[in-house]
Structure formats: structure tokens, C-alpha cells
């Protein structure tokens, strides 16, 4: 599970990690949230590119609906056949974005997502850590609704990821360096799980 704020390199690192796993003969299913299913793509479009304002609770519910479909359609079947699932976002995103960033509360958002995930939890959470200022400079051109949020929101999300990582034993990887260096740092964390 790769996590982090906007423009921390999650998609890039998920692709690199999945490729490294495949190179070692491990079936790796690369996926993402929101939008990793047909229903999810529709919810993602509404959530990130819709014109109507979205209430924070409605946002959390939309993401939980996407997650429930994602778990049922992609994650659970992949795990059932023994594949590794490399996901760009999962429940930790909701805890940071909706629980802290939107002020809904981590415990409340976690409870909502317990229903959506039906007991599926990641074996490993890697948070790609980049300051919001550096991350913002990485986002070219047109931004989606979350990328357009103010600096205070992005700082709250960034700090939430750091706090949650420390409290829950998630791995924090400095993602401010080059893509290859970050990929090596991510692989170093994953290698510990692979080691017998």
C-alpha cells in the first residue's frame, strides 16, 4: 500500500514496485483508489472533477463506496488467488484526508471504512513523505478538486500521515529525492517483508 499526499509519487512508485515484484516471479496487481473499478471511475469523476460542491461527509461516503467496490471486485479476488496487491491509496488516505483534513475524526472515518473493507487490511503501508510545498510544485497545469485545496489543508493531511505512520507503525519514506532513489527506498522496506 503506497500512501501520501498529492504529488508524492504514489502512482510512479506503485508501478515500479509492481514491476520489481513481477521480476521476482510474484504476481502483482497494481491498482488505485479512487477509481480502480468501473463504478469507482464514475465516483472519482464526480468527486474530483464535478462542478457541485461536495460536503465532507458525502466525500467520505463516496470514497468508502468506491473502496467497497474496489475490495469486492479487485482486492479480495486478487488476494484469494495469492497475488500481491500494490495499491495507490487505501484506508489510510481516508484517515488523513477526511478524518483529519476534513475534520470528520479518524475514529469515525475508520469505522465507516471497516464496513467498506469487510476486514481487508494491508500487510504493509508505505507513506511517501514530501513537504506540501515541494509536492505542489510537482503538479503541472489543471488541478483536481483536492489538489486545489489551500495550503492549510495540505499541511494538515501531511502532518496526519506523519502522525498516523508513527502511531500505527507504517513505514515513512522520504520521497523528495529522485524517482530511482525513492524506488530503492520503497524496495528496501518491501524486501523486509519478502525475507524469510
Predicted regions and their residues:
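A glycine- and Lys/Arg-enriched "phosphate-lid" helix/loop adjacent to the NTP-binding pocket
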Residues: 89, 94-159
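Conserved lysine of the Walker
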Residues: 10
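NTP-dependent small-molecule kinase module
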Residues: 16-18, 133-196
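ATP-dependent small-molecule kinase phosphotransfer cores
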Residues: 24-117
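Walker A (P-loop) phosphate-binding loop of P-loop NTPases
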Residues: 7
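Hydrophobic/aromatic beta-strand patches that form the interior of the parallel beta-sheet core
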Residues: 31, 86, 124-126, 171-173
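Hydrophobic anchor at the beta1->P-loop junction of P-loop NTPases
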Residues: 2
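Hydrophobic positions on the alpha1 helix immediately C-terminal to the Walker A/P-loop
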Residues: 13
Amino acid at each position: 500500500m503506497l500512501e501520501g499526499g498529492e504529488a508524492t509519487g504514489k502512482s510512479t512508485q506503485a508501478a515500479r514496485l509492481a514491476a520489481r515484484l513481477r521480476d521476482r516471479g510474484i504476481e502483482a496487481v497494481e491498482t488505485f483508489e479512487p477509481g480502480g473499478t468501473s463504478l469507482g471511475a464514475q465516483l472519482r469523476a464526480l468527486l474530483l472533477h464535478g462542478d457541485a460542491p461536495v460536503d465532507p461527509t458525502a466525500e467520505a461516503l463516496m470514497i468508502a463506496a468506491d473502496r467497497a467496490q474496489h475490495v469486492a471486485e479487485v482486492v479480495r479476488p486478487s488476494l484469494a488467488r495469492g497475488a500481491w496487491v500494490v495499491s495507490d491509496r487505501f484506508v489510510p488516505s481516508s484517515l488523513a484526508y477526511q478524518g483529519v483534513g476534513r475534520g470528520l475524526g479518524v475514529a469515525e472515518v475508520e469505522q465507516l471504512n471497516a464496513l467498506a473493507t469487510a476486514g481487508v487490511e494491508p500487510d504493509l503501508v508505505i507513506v511517501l513523505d514530501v513537504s506540501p510545498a515541494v509536492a505542489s510544485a510537482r503538479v503541472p497545469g489543471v488541478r483536481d478538486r483536492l489538489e486545489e485545496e489551500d495550503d492549510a489543508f495540505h499541511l494538515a493531511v501531511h502532518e496526519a500521515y506523519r502522525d498516523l505512520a508513527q502511531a500505527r507503525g507504517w513505514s515513512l519514506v522520504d520521497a523528495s529525492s529522485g524517482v530511482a532513489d525513492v524506488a530503492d527506498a520503497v524496495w528496501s522496506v518491501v524486501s523486509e517483508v519478502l525475507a524469510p
